[in-house]
């Protein structure tokens, strides 16, 4: 809702003289919106990159650390309450896509339509992929990324990435 109707909701909130708070729509309990808007307001963002979905990160972590197949890791996530009964939005990357659209709007002022952003989830990731990544010194993470180009244009996408094990993102 925030990714597609955020501008309209903000306008309505201003008309009604109320606050429009949407911190939980990106990152859940991890504060990112307020620091971007308040603490880093004087900074110029060139790129936003991160792991934006806890369900997919849990699944990939189970595959990486415990050798659990995708389907079994998804089932564990559902049993543990990390995944919805219908996890499609998470595992297909749509939830992360909506979040990177919100963050891109805040960082760059560019409004991306989530339906027009390149988005690939984790449903095709196999244990063989995880093993190959390990041999390369990497782990697989679903990353949302938005980039401001030198010409002022911007693009965003969500896709599985090979992340070097030394990267801070690998430890998430």
Regions found by a protein language model. Give the residues of each.
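Conserved anion/nucleotide-ligand pocket segment
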Residues: 37-98, 103
């Amino acid at each position: 809702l925030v990714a597609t109707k955020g501008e309209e909701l903000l306008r309505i909130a201003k008309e009604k003289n109320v606050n429009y708070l949407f911190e939980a729509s990106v990152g859940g309990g991890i504060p990112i919106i307020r620091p971007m808007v308040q603490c880093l307001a004087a900074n110029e963002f060139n790129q936003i990159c991160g792991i934006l979905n806890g369900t997919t990160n849990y699944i990939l972590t189970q595959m990486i650390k415990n050798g659990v197949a995708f389907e079994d890791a998804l089932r564990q996530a559902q049993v543990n309450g990390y995944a919805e009964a219908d996890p499609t939005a998470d595992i297909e990357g749509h939830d992360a896509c909506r979040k990177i659209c919100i963050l891109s709007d805040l960082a760059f002022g560019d409004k991306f339509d989530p339906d027009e952003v390149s988005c690939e989830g984790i449903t095709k990731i196999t244990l063989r992929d995880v093993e190959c990544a390990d041999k390369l010194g990497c782990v697989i993470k679903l990353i949302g990324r938005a980039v401001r180009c030198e010409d002022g244009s911007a693009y965003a996408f969500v896709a599985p990435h090979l992340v070097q094990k030394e990267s801070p993102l690998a430890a998430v």
